[in-house]
Amino acid sequence: MTVRTPGTPASKIDKTPATTPNGHRGREEKIVVTVRLRPLNKRELSAKDHAAWECIDDHTIIYRPVPQERAAQPASSFTFDKVFGPDSITEAVYEEGVKNVALSSLMGINATIFAYGQTSSGKTYTMRGITEKAVNDIYAHIMSTPEREFRIRISGLEIYNENVRDLLNSESGRSLKLLDDPEKGTVVEKLVEETASNDQHLRHLISICEAQRQVGETALNDTSSRSHQIIRLTIESTLRESSDCVRSYVASLNFVDLAGSERASQTNADGARLREGCHINLSLMTLTTVIRKLSVGKRSGHIPYRDSKLTRILQHSLGGNARTAIICTLSPASSHVEQSRNTLYFATRAKEVTNNAQVNMVVSDKQLVKHLQKEVARLEAELRTPDPANEKDWKIQQMEMEIEELKRQRDLAQSQVDELRRKLQEEQGPKPSESVSPVVKKCLSFSGTLSPNLEEKAPVRSERTRNTMGRQSMRQSLAAPFTLMHEIRKLEHLQEQLGDEANRALEVLQKEVACHRLGNQDAAETIAKLQAEIREMRSIRPLPKEVEVGSVVAVNKSVSANLKEEIARLHSQGSTIADLEEQLENVQKSLDKLVMSLPSNNDQQSNNDTTQKAKHPSKKKKLLPLTSSNSINRQNFLKSPCSPLSTARQVLDCEVENRAPDSDDLSCEIQPDETPTKSDGGDVSSKEGTPYRRSSSVNMRKMQKMFQEAAEENVRNIRSYVTELKERVAKLQYQKQLLVCQVLELEANEAAGYNLEDDENIHQIPEESPVSWQITFKEQRQQIIDLWDVCYVSIIHRSQFYLLFKGDPADEIYLEVELRRLTWLQQHLAELGNATPARVGNEPTVSLSSSIRALKREREFLAKRLTTRLTAEERDYLYIKWEVPLEGKQRRMQFINKLWTNPHDAKHVHESAEIVAKLVGFCEGGNMSREMFELNFVLPSDRRPWFAGWNQISDLLHI
């Protein structure tokens, strides 16, 4: 009789593990079952035993009895996921049978690999090879995944005579307790867990576990395993620090080498070996019972996991949260046919067991806190700066709703007007007094009609009163649409006037900016004049030898006197420049006030005005924003365009004019005593009064939105121009100080002395040739580089200066200024030593320790930029080039600390500057210019303006 069982579908084996965050959902898949048939061993060959089992293909194994036994035992076949014959190697068993299951532990899915079979069938031999191959693949995957950080922990235990023993700690005792954990399941108390540092360390720990296992000799096997061995690898992987992901994968990989089932009649066991065999068979019988009940598919019945410590420890691997692979090993000998057949029956049932594998993710407390802090910061930023698109959409929806409401009310009013007109035309006749009564009856909102008796008893005066009130209500209903149209035209006129006033306000600001612009031209002309005189002084030709010494001295004194006069003028203009800066600040504040005064809360203002009107109906507005009486005041505000006070007044006036117009002047046409009472005509008057109030609010919002867009554009243009003026003022201040330094140098040279009696000392300053300038440039730049290193100057500043000034003759002035600044800084640091100077106001203190700390923070900043500005390949290339170990820790800081460390190596300096420039990005887009860079090279002194350019690098580090 041939028995064929279906194999597990390949789609359920080869499918990549699905990512299921937090482990809430998994996917069902069946246990992968493979069968390995070993060749006949020496004992079986010596006993002239023959092979009774044969693998006919990769999925089927068949029983072939000897001819004399075919009648009693017919041939039978079994089909599994994979079948390996006697010639197969362990590597093939691993690659084609259990590799996918083993490597799924790297993705956060628990995995278990069993070796099941009778004694002497090759279980331990197979599991050793499987474990070795799995370790190789695990570490190969770790090396190919540098973006994740892996940590592997190993523990080993054996179950010997139903006692749990720790294989990594022989002193732990013979029996460890099993505890139930609500999250981890069944755990072994006091089980040692070692962390593997590398693959060699892991193999060493596995070999220790194998050496500590109980092994004995039987009639079937010289080295028979007398206990169940479980080696568990706990693999945890986390993304590196550069990622924002806070979840980690945690999974366990179990290598289970079961002891073989045996018959006492075949093993000839007695005493201790017999007792060991009994415990082995009992635990394997419990495992078979669990597999049989799980294969039925009905989970409602009791599954005896707790009947054996083996099934209790491996409960998750049997129908739980894990992927499981079972390797059943067989002996082909005909003397073991019954044991082999029982093994195949066990494998057939195991094929039908379904597991529910899930991805196990955990979040560490430290990573969770960092993630939550970032999330809180992001949410706070969103609250501080709401999405303009959403706010704009909300406003559009509000306006659309108001427009629809106004349209509905307009249609209602129009229908009422048409109805009134039609009734009036129908009732027109020879007696006008008779035509009033029907209209009044239609217009007045009575809850019912008067009875005939009450009509007869009503006096004539009440009849006349009702007729009069009816005519008034009719006139108000007719006048409401025309009033609405009149108010719309009035609002359009107000919109035009408000636009004109806004244009006038912006013209005033532009005139004020132009006034400041003309004010600093005198200082610029004076500085240009001084520069021309200095160039003229340097270009004086050599005087003839017969020129008298007195004339030369007179010329030098006259030049010095002229320069001193110009310096005095510049100092006198210092207050002018300060006033100019103050005026520019006032203009900036005026612009900010103008932006803040733009209408943004119109709805609230309109509601406040309406509420105030309702509380005080008889109170009139004394100051209307756009009436002719205020035109004279507005002209007075525009008289002084250059005064900051006038600018502030103009901004305040614009703020008053941008308010919503009071609705008291709109409602004055309808007298309070003419309005019908609520009982008579209140419904009609309330319906007629709502549309034009809402229409005025909508038109005012439209008008203010148009004005706001135009005003914001003009304010942005003026603000950019004011910023440019501030930069020019700072540049003029710097040039003035530079000229002062040059004059002081000339006086020092004159005092230090020219020996005017010797003709050789009266000579012209020779014009430097390109060759001599290049030599001077290299010497000065090398001095600057040395001083940079001594004074712990910012390496970003070094790189920017080094790459910007490359030997052009126009660079002479910048090198001179930098050399002076560094010389002063060196002297200043030498005088201070390790002391820290006292802080004066808000000015930064410069000391040796503060410079070192600033340089350290700057290097940390550049190390962080490595991951964002460079690719992984570029970083590895630089690590190799700068001799930074690729496997070392803190590679980025090691690399950054090597930059700008050798000032005497020109190649090192150039490469360091290029790397820093690439990390900071100031060379991108050509944004380096001498005009802006000169503000960073000002000499320090006790005056505040000298520190104008010292904060550039610190500002960059706080981006």
Curated annotation (Swiss-Prot):
One GO BP annotation is: microtubule-based movement
Please name the CDD domains in this protein's record: KISc_CENP_E
Where does this protein chiefly localize? cytoplasm
Q: Where is this region: Disordered?
A: 1-28, 417-438, 451-473, 598-640, 658-700
**What InterPro entries does its record include?**
Kinesin-like_fam, Kinesin_motor_CS, Kinesin_motor_dom, Kinesin_motor_dom_sf, NACK_C, P-loop_NTPase
Give residues where Phosphothreonine occurs.
T145, T675, T690
Q: Which GO terms describe its cellular component?
A: microtubule; nucleus; phragmoplast
Q: How is it modified after translation?
A: Phosphorylated at Thr-145, Thr-675 and Thr-690 by CDKAs and CDKBs. The phosphorylation occurs before metaphase and inhibits the interaction with NPK1 preventing the transition to cytokinesis.
Basic and acidic residues bias spans: 418-429, 454-466
Provide the coiled-coil residue spans.
362-429, 557-598
Biased composition (Polar residues) is annotated at 630-640
Q: Which residues form the Kinesin motor domain?
A: 30-353
Q: Where is this region: Required for the binding to NPK1?
A: 685-756
A Gene Ontology molecular function term for this protein is: microtubule binding
Q: List other remarks.
A: Expression of a truncated protein lacking the motor domain causes inhibition of phragmoplast expansion and multinucleate cells.
Q: What does this protein do?
A: Probable plus end-directed motor protein that functions in the NACK-PQR (NPK1-NQK1/MEK1-NRK1) MAP kinase signaling pathway, which is essential for somatic cell cytokinesis, especially for the cell-plate formation and its expansion. Regulates the activity and the localization of NPK1 by association through the non-catalytic region of the kinase.
Q: What name has this protein been given in UniProt?
A: Kinesin-like protein NACK1
Question: Species name for this entry?
Answer: Nicotiana tabacum
The taxonomic lineage of its organism, from the top, reads:
Eukaryota, Viridiplantae, Streptophyta, Embryophyta, Tracheophyta
